[in-house]
Amino acid sequence: MKKFYNRQKELKALQTVSEQIVETKGQLSVMVGRRRVGKTRLLNEAFHQENTKFLYLFISRKSERSLVAEFAEIINSELGVKFFQPQSLRDIIEFLLDYTKQKPLTIIIDEFQDIDIVNPALFSDIQNLWDANKRDSMMHLVPFPFNSDRLSY
């Protein structure tokens, strides 16, 4: 494995947000940077080091149905949720927002910019769900790469 250098400040910032999520409620961390500079590695290092409960979801250019099945399997496996059978990505986001009303969780969504390709309405759905639930949720949401013009904070 390649060595990981000079990212202590960034690691600490990410870890601090996740550690404080119980008190601060819903938090959004925006990760931006050129391709191949180590964004995914930074996130993995940050949350593996602290043993923070987190989900890593990769938005590949598949059908929404395929992603729903893939993400449901990850959620079932990582969170120990039984009988979770969502029909849409919106269902998954709604479930995770409800889940984080009881338990803190960091959710990393890689290749977030491709969400429009999977379902053009989903970005607005996520924004509406986030705005309605962030004050009651202990979710640390980390979408990346990210076009910051698209989401209100």
Question: Where in the sequence are the language-model features?
Answer:
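Phosphate-binding site recognition
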Residues: 1-153
